[in-house]
Swiss-Prot record:
UniProt binding sites for ATP: G30, A31, N32, A33, Q34, G35, K36, T37
Gene coding for it: recF
GO molecular function term, any single one: single-stranded DNA binding
A single cellular component GO annotation: cytoplasm
The family this protein is said to belong to: Belongs to the RecF family.
Protein known as: DNA replication and repair protein RecF
PROSITE patterns, A to Z: RECF_1 (PS00617), RECF_2 (PS00618)
Transmembrane segments: none
Entry keyword ATP-binding: yes
Locations listed in the record: Cytoplasm
GO BP, sorted A to Z: DNA replication; DNA synthesis involved in DNA repair; double-strand break repair; SOS response
Length: 371
């Protein structure tokens, strides 16, 4: 999978961009606050129809403009496709090959990207909510079914929590309606837990090999999926559905008392276990960085495994955060097989013997030019 051509109109600090890219390594070089991260963000937005930096789409529109447009020509095994997002103050519109998509969910999955930014180095020791967002964003790209189940689950969770609050404050009395919401939540929750268990197991295997390679066999790594359902049941969605139903029944009185759902995958987490210890609490900073790198590289392999194609990789000033050994491993892992966009303030320190002939672009005050 490659991004061949990108067109921007009124996006952040870019009035207009129209450029083609190398199918291998593309380096965006420039001083700070010139628009390097904005350009990477636009590629991310083209893929996922949302920013990784803000939940307010209006921030993506250039100051004083009515709309922003992001358009790209993407090459896949199935052929070349034009993707387009138009972001206005009224909302977003998505097109594939000039055909309007009624739902954003029908747009997603046509272009897959993986972003690696300095803040991702903290993924192993960040919050459970951050790890859940990470899981959902990546797995949702790989599987339309996962994305659908996640969307449905969030809808029913919101409705159920609102109704639990009504029951708490005696504004509602009908427990039959609560049972209907609970059954739907258990059904979609079971699908999510089963999918997460399967995908995390595969991703863990990839990450374990990478961690061993980086550390020359000194460190073992595996993922420990933390969910309320017993591990022996997670491979069967029907058994997970039954288990969730039993837990909801047991917790119903407490849920009404607290006005919120206490059971379900919205409480999941993933622990990264290095040499039999939770690296977030007991690992060194070096181990945490190696683990974060292994997780990100495992994402690439998992996406290839699930979709049949490598994603596009976005590296936002991350090379400066890695020592020479980790930088070398990252660059060797991606060279020639993964189209990559990386930002940097200087080419100094980048492993030039690995990136022999990158396409270099100069970013300066919202303009992009081939260097």
């Amino acid at each position: 999978m490659k991004l061949d051509h990108l067109v921007l109109k009124n996006y952040r600090n870019y009035a207009a961009v129209d450029t083609t890219f190398s199918p291998e390594i593309n380096v965006l070089i420039g001083a700070n606050a010139q628009g390097k991260t904005n350009l990477l963000e636009s590629i991310y937005v083209l893929a996922l129809a949302r920013s990784h930096r803000t939940n307010n789409d209006k921030e993506l529109i250039r100051f004083g403009s009515e709309f922003a447009r992001v358009s790209g020509q993407v090459s896949r095994q199935s052929g070349s496709h034009q993707l387009e997002l138009i972001i206005s103050h009224q909302g977003k519109r998505a097109r594939i090959d000039r055909i309007e998509q009624p739902k954003l969910s029908q747009y997603l999955g046509h272009f897959n990207v993986i972003l690696f930014a300095p803040e991702d180095l903290a993924i192993v020791k960040g919050s459970p909510a951050g790890r859940r967002r990470f899981i959902d964003m990546e797995f949702g790209q790989m599987s339309p079914k996962y994305l659908y189940n996640l969307s449905q689950y969030k809808t029913f969770l919101k409705q159920r929590n609102a109704y639990l609050k009504q029951l708490k404050y005696h504004q509602a009395k009908d427990l039959v309606y609560l049972d209907v919401l609970t059954d739907s939540l258990a059904a979609f929750g079971a699908e999510l837990i089963t999918a997460r268990a399967k995908l995390l197991e595969t991703m863990s295997d990839y990450a374990a090999t990478i961690q061993q390679d980086i550390t020359k066999g000194r460190e073992s790594l595996h993922f420990s999926y933390q969910t309320q359902v017993d591990p022996s049941l997670r491979g069967d969605s029907e058994q997970v559905y039954t288990a969730l139903g039993e837990m909801f029944a047991k917790q119903q009185a407490r849920e009404i008392e607290q006005g919120t759902s206490l059971v379900g995958p919205q409480r999941d987490d993933v622990l990264f276990i290095v040499n039999d210890k939770d690296v977030a609490n007991f690992g060194s900073q070096g181990q945490q960085r190696t683990t974060a790198l292994a997780v990100k590289l495992a994402e690439i392999d998992l996406m290839k495994d699930q979709t049949g194609e490598y994603p596009v990789l976005l590296l936002d000033d991350v090379l400066s955060e890695l020592d020479a050994a980790r930088q070398t491993h990252l660059l060797k892992a991606i060279q020639t097989k993964v189209q990559t966009f990386l930002t940097t303030t200087s080419l100094e320190g980048i492993q030039k013997e690995i990136i022999a002939t990158p396409a270099v672009f100069k970013v300066d005050e919202g303009t992009l030019a081939r260097a």
